[in-house]
């Protein structure tokens, strides 16, 4: 699914496909994300802004919303959102990425509060710190990647 262009019916179809194949869903790990531009807000391209918001904030919301009925069928389902340090302490030039991560942190709280007394679905947000990815290399081009943990190394945080 292309999160930058996905429409509601695509999320609905995904839920239908999962239901037909598995009957329930045990968890979602929202790890898809794009950086966008590291540039002053006054110069930020509106199309890039929209794409970052669609991938980093709208897609996790839409996926969780559409898959929630399947999550509620599982005995102990979990939704994990991923954030970043800029999600709670914005830094200059991080633009749409920082705003989307702040939104993710609030979205996590909203889902957790709304589901706390009505289901067994757990909702959490994790900031895994720096992770060796292409996006990290784009954001920090002078950083030595050997000093940054890989996705495999941080996976225990999510289990």
Where are these regions (language model features)?
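Rossmann-fold cofactor-recognition segment
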Residues: 1-8
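Substrate-binding pocket helix/loop in short-chain dehydrogenase/reductase
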Residues: 14, 39-41, 45-50
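Conserved catalytic-site loops of classical short-chain dehydrogenases/reductases
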Residues: 26-27, 50, 76-82, 121-124
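Conserved NAD(P)H cofactor-binding loop of Rossmann-fold oxidoreductase domains
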Residues: 31-37
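Catalytic loop of short-chain dehydrogenase/reductase
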Residues: 34, 72, 76-117, 130
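A short, exposed helix-loop element centered on a Lys and neighboring polar residues
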Residues: 64-65, 109
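C-terminal helical subdomain
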Residues: 121, 125-126, 133, 142-159
């Amino acid at each position: 699914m292309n999160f930058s262009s996905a429409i509601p019916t695509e999320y609905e179809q995904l839920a239908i496909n999962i239901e037909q194949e598995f009957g329930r869903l045990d968890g979602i790990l929202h790890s898809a994300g794009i950086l966008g531009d590291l540039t002053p807000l006054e110069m930020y391209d509106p199309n890039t802004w929209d794409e970052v918001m669609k991938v980093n904030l709208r897609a996790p919301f839409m996926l969780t919303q559409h898959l929630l009925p399947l999550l509620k069928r599982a005995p102990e389902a979990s939704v994990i959102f991923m954030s970043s340090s800029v999600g709670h302490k914005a830094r200059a030039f991080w633009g749409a990425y920082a705003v989307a991560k702040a939104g993710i942190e609030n979205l996590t709280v909203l889902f957790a509060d709304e589901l706390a007394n009505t289901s067994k679905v757990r909702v959490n947000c994790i900031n895994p710190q720096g992770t060796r990815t292409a996006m990290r290399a784009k954001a920090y081009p002078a950083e030595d990647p050997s000093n940054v943990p890989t996705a495999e190394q941080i996976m225990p945080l999510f289990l």
